Amino acid sequence: MTLSEQNIDKEELAKFSDLAQDWWNPAGKMKPLHLINPVRLKYIEQQITLKGKHVLDVGCGGGLLSEALAKHGAIVTGVDMSESLIDVAKNHAEQQQLNINYQCQDIEILTKDAQRFDIITCMELLEHVPDPQRMIKNCAALIKPGGKLFFSTINRNFKAYLYTIVGAEYVFNLLPKGTHDYAQFIRPSELTQWAESGGLRLLDITGIHYHPLKNEFDLSRDVSVNYLACFTHE
């Protein structure tokens, strides 16, 4: 499969690859990801027990979520198309003495293998690929019957634009400028429609809210900006 056939935005891939060496710096450019990671883990554990489960972390980056899942007892495979991020993830896991199967691999290739997973996580990735529906379909093909899939992304509305682009990238400098493209944001209704067309059933949608005075994130009923969704394949 050539790069042009893969569900990859080369500019997005290069942008995040350039952040590889700063990935595990909690005060660096990936600080928001460090702040949001405990909330993602909390949400997953509200939906399913991790211990002993086979988990696929799609778009694992430098391994923030993969390591958290492994520390909570999951058997984790992390895939990402960035070689530099996979190298960072492997090195950090080795330092932490964690056994995580990291692969620089296209998820579409994995669908041709026999292995299926109890849990699939695809966090902060859908808004960075050319065809998010195709990504969801591939995730659905890799889940076991009764397994759970978790997606997190950003709603598409004026409030989300103000918070995640104007606020986070330009006013408060929480993220590097150009991290997000508003046109790539995804409404919950769109995510649900794409997932259902891939044979998935929605179990829950929960928002993520940022408290600027506390400088922390938490789960919320408000899905107008960042949100998490849990689906199952029956």
Curated annotation (Swiss-Prot):
Highest rank taxon of the organism: Bacteria
Annotated CDD domains: AdoMet_MTases
GO terms, biological process: methylation
Residues noted as binding S-adenosyl-L-methionine in the record, renumbered to the chain: 40, 59, 80, 123
Enzyme Commission no: 2.1.1.222, 2.1.1.64
Pathway assignment: Cofactor biosynthesis; ubiquinone biosynthesis
S-S pairs: none
Alphabetized UniProt keyword annotations: Methyltransferase, S-adenosyl-L-methionine, Transferase, Ubiquinone biosynthesis
Pfam families, per database record: Methyltransf_23
InterPro entries, per database record: SAM-dependent_MTases_sf, UbiG_MeTrfase
GO molecular function: 2-polyprenyl-6-hydroxyphenol methylase activity; 3-demethylubiquinol 3-O-methyltransferase activity; methyltransferase activity; polyprenyldihydroxybenzoate methyltransferase activity
Catalysed reaction equations from the record: a 3-demethylubiquinol + S-adenosyl-L-methionine = a ubiquinol + S-adenosyl-L-homocysteine + H(+); a 3-(all-trans-polyprenyl)benzene-1,2-diol + S-adenosyl-L-methionine = a 2-methoxy-6-(all-trans-polyprenyl)phenol + S-adenosyl-L-homocysteine + H(+)
Family label: Belongs to the methyltransferase superfamily. UbiG/COQ3 family.
Function according to Swiss-Prot or TrEMBL: O-methyltransferase that catalyzes the 2 O-methylation steps in the ubiquinone biosynthetic pathway.
Protein name: Ubiquinone biosynthesis O-methyltransferase
Species assigned in the record: Coxiella burnetii (strain RSA 493 / Nine Mile phase I)
Gene: ubiG
